[in-house]
């Protein structure tokens, strides 16, 4: 499916900046070879990693670190690996693994147009329904495509309304354990039917499905289809007739945007997508249960793990360094998931949330990781070349993000120097 890099809106609002531009240009990640000119320190690796973590304003008792050699199957550093800590956006690693496992890298999310009524001549006597299934990338470009499909059926006039159906998910606009400020600043309102990440004219709509219906009515008008009735929130009848559909990009591209840019909105919709996988209404709680079940099936230790939301914004989320490294190992060892999982991570000094970190040798380009930052947590977890999986989690009230990141970067750099 072709992606339109300009459909979301002005670039000066990060909540409006959609994934399309990132998805369209993302490329497969290669692991560069080690720097042959670098000389390894004579100090034991364990000591150098411990020294890397020794920074002020970060409490060792509220920190954890784990480094694992993927080639030997041995741990090379362990500190508080079973300590239950707030993971910040490292929570997205669990959602990424569960989504790729349960849905598959090629999975696409469908948005449908349905007709309630019948076509008489060129008039649809009844209403049209725009039915969402949680596509975080749906844009006005997609609505235009749906409108063209409606016109292609011969419809030129709709006597009823345009309904926005978001019933595939529940109607909770936030996830459990969020501060009220997160709803305003860190994620658009959650819904199974959103267009342009709920941006509607000049603001984020608090009624996403009704806003989507209104935008679809406009799209129909531009295609020469007149709708007599209003745009409203509604639910499709069981006997509604399919009139068209558009698909999201593949899941592999969606998680690439989500993890590289640490996008909270996408993570929360994917969590609800997992909750709806068994035919039930998608909720954060059902999605969280599916994530936990998936981790358990992979043999990942769940003591100290609590999955509440998809993004890591919830103050109730907890992970351990051992569980995160377990997720990394599980993804690494599954050939059908590994390329998509690894490619989703930011590349040190080059892309995503690591573009301006770890820019020097030997870490640049060889550390692939997921960052995480909230007021109480900082984290960095991922891979170093094809050799190490690692996780560093640090908590505090508040945590010093500057010093925490310094420790994380030093830890990853030591591994990259091996």
What is the predicted role of each segment?
Residues 199-340:
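A small/polar active-site loop signature that marks catalytic segments
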Residues 105, 109-169, 183-185, 191-195:
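Active-site-adjacent, His/Asp/Glu-enriched structural segments that form or flank metal-binding
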Residues 60-62, 80-82, 88-91, 104-108, ...:
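Extracytoplasmic
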Residues 26-31, 35-84, 146-154:
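Beta-lactamase-like hydrolase cores
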Residues 73, 87-105, 162, 193, ...:
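Active-site SXXK
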Residues 101-116, 224-232, 338-342:
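Short, well-structured active-site flanking segments
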Residues 76-78, 275-418:
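Small-residue-rich helix-loop
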Residues 64-68, 76-78, 95, 112-114, ...:
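Soluble periplasmic/extracytoplasmic beta-strand elements of cell-envelope proteins
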């Amino acid at each position: 499916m072709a992606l339109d890099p300009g459909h979301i809106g002005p670039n000066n609002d990060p909540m409006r900046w959609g994934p399309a531009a990132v998805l369209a240009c993302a490329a497969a990640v290669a692991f560069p070879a080690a720097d042959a000119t670098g000389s390894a320190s004579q100090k034991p690796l364990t000591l150098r990693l411990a020294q890397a973590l020794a920074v002020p304003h970060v409490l060792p008792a509220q920190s954890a670190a784990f480094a694992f050699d993927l080639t030997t199957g041995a741990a090379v550093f362990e500190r508080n690996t079973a300590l239950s800590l707030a993971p910040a956006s490292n929570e997205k690693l669990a959602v990424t693994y569960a989504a790729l496992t349960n849905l598959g890298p090629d999975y696409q999310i469908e948005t449908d147009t349905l007709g309630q009524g019948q076509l008489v001549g060129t008039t649809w006597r009844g209403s049209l329904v725009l039915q969402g299934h949680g596509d975080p990338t749906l844009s006005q470009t997609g609505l235009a495509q749906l409108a063209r499909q409606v016109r292609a059926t011969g419809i030129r006039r709709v006597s009823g309304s345009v309904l926005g159906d978001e019933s595939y998910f529940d109607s909770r606009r936030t996830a459990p354990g969020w501060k009220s400020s997160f709803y305003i600043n860190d994620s658009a309102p959650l819904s199974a039917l959103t267009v342009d990440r709920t941006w509607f004219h000049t603001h984020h709509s608090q009624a996403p499905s009704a806003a989507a219906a209104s935008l679809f009515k406009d799209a129909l008008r531009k295609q020469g289809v007149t709708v007599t009735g209003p745009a409203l929130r509604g639910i499709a009848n069981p006997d509604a007739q399919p009139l068209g559909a558009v698909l999201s990009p593949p899941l592999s591209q969606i998680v690439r945007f989500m993890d590289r840019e640490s996008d909270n909105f996408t993570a929360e919709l994917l969590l609800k997508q997992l909750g709806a996988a068994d035919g039930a209404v998608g909720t954060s709680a059902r999605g969280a249960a599916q994530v936990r079940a998936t981790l358990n099936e992979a043999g990942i230790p769940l003591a100290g793990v609590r999955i509440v939301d998809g993004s890591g914004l919830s103050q109730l989320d907890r992970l351990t360094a051992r569980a995160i490294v377990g997720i990394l190992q599980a993804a690494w060892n599954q050939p059908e998931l590994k390329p998509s999982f690894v490619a989703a991570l930011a590349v040190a000094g080059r892309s995503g949330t690591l573009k301006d970190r770890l820019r020097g040798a030997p870490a640049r380009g060889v550390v692939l990781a997921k960052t995480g930052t909230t007021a109480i947590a900082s984290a960095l977890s991922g891979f170093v070349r094809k050799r190490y999986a690692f996780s560093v989690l640090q908590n505090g009230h508040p945590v010093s993000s500057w010093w925490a990141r310094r420790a994380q970067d030093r830890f990853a750099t030591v591994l990259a120097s091996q």
